């Protein structure tokens, strides 16, 4: 009798342990938590002033990689800024930048001429000659935070 009871107990334990896998929990809760977690610049056009071999002043443009330039993200004040100004001759009107958000939130940028928002695309150049406002929305679409970005 003991020999028949052990396989029966193993089968019952197997059925009970596999029964917990039958629940199909398809409800997914999106997070309301949102923040900008990273901000980096790309290549910027910079004008360099130099003298030619004849002693005449001349200028030339060069695309310089500023991805290593440090930016601070103040989560309390919702501000993003660089502690050191960009070098002389950098054109801040056409800047490529990359923005990372918490929980893959949606990042939008406010228009300079109206109150409309558009989806931020890191392949489009952005005018940072004036402070810009970025909005990051949570995955649930309920919560958002507004950040002011200053590039000096």
Predicted regions and their residues:
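Positively charged n-region of N-terminal signal peptides that target proteins for export
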Residues: 1-7, 23
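C-terminal motif of bacterial Sec signal peptides marking the signal peptidase cleavage site
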Residues: 16-20
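Beta-rich interaction/scaffold domains
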Residues: 21-152
């Amino acid at each position: 009798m003991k020999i028949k009871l052990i396989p029966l107990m193993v089968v019952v334990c197997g059925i009970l342990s596999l029964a917990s896998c039958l629940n199909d929990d398809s409800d997914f809760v999106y997070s309301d938590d949102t923040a900008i977690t990273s901000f980096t610049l790309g290549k910027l056009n910079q004008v360099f002033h130099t003298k030619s071999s004849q002693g005449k002043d001349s200028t030339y443009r060069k695309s310089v990689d500023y991805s290593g330039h440090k930016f601070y993200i103040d989560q309390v004040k919702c501000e993003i800024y660089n502690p050191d100004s960009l070098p002389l001759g950098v054109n801040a009107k056409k800047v490529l930048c990359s923005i990372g958000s918490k929980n893959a939130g949606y990042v939008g940028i406010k228009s300079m001429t109206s109150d409309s928002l558009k989806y931020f695309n890191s392949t489009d150049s952005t005018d940072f000659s004036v402070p810009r406002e970025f909005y990051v929305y949570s995955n649930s679409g309920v919560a958002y935070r507004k950040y002011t970005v200053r590039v000096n």
